[in-house]
């Protein structure tokens, strides 16, 4: 598999996670950031915004988080906006990034296991906080297997970025 399109994720060990949101996702981002910081599967958590009272358009926050992952400064990103859609679309503009909006356990698991998605996006207006917490917990437990049948498909996705 071609690994030049994104920084490889470690097979084991704690993850470096970047979090971000717009003002519509601030409450969930703050709660999930605290959960991540307390989780032994997470080595570091970086917050790229927004903070209380800030009004930064979601594309700027999502792209900053995605760039950190693509450059290898973080392993994964968790983004929250009103629907989870805008931040996913924005993050996917960064070469090598596979961002998904997922609001159910199966999709969260498959996003990593089948698609090697490094960025998980939620909509604060779409799901409850306890479900978001459960999904983040499940997400942290998943690792992509570079030897899986999905690896060839993920490599094909990366190939389209260069064509």
Region locations from a protein language model:
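Short, structured active-site "lid" loops
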Residues: 60-79, 83
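Mid-chain, well-packed structural core segment of small domains
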Residues: 79-125
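Short active-site oxyanion
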Residues: 16-17, 74-77, 96-98
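C-terminal binding/interaction regions
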Residues: 2-6, 10-13, 18-27, 105-163
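Residues that form or flank phosphate/diphosphate-binding pockets in enzymes
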Residues: 27-28, 56, 86, 130
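A short beta-strand-loop structural module common to alpha/beta enzyme folds
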Residues: 43-55
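Short, solvent-exposed amphipathic alpha-helices that sit
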Residues: 27-38
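Short, high-confidence coil segments that cap the C-terminus of an alpha-helix
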Residues: 42, 73-75, 116
């Amino acid at each position: 598999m071609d690994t030049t399109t994104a920084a490889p994720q470690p097979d084991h060990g704690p993850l470096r996670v970047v979090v971000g949101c717009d003002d519509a996702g601030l409450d969930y981002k703050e709660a999930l950031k605290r959960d991540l910081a307390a989780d032994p599967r997470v080595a570091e958590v970086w917050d790229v915004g927004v903070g209380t009272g800030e009004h930064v358009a979601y594309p700027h926050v999502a792209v900053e988080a995605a760039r950190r992952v693509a450059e290898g400064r973080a392993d994964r990103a968790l983004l929250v906006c009103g629907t989870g859609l805008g931040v996913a679309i924005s993050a996917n503009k960064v070469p090598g990034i596979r961002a998904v909006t997922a609001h159910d356990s199966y999709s969260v698991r498959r996003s990593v296991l089948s698609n090697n998605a490094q960025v998980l996006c939620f909509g604060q207006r779409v799901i409850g906080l306890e479900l978001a917490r459960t999904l983040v917990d499940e997400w942290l437990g998943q690792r992509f297997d570079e030897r899986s049948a999905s690896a060839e498909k993920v490599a094909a996705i990366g190939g389209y970025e260069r064509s």
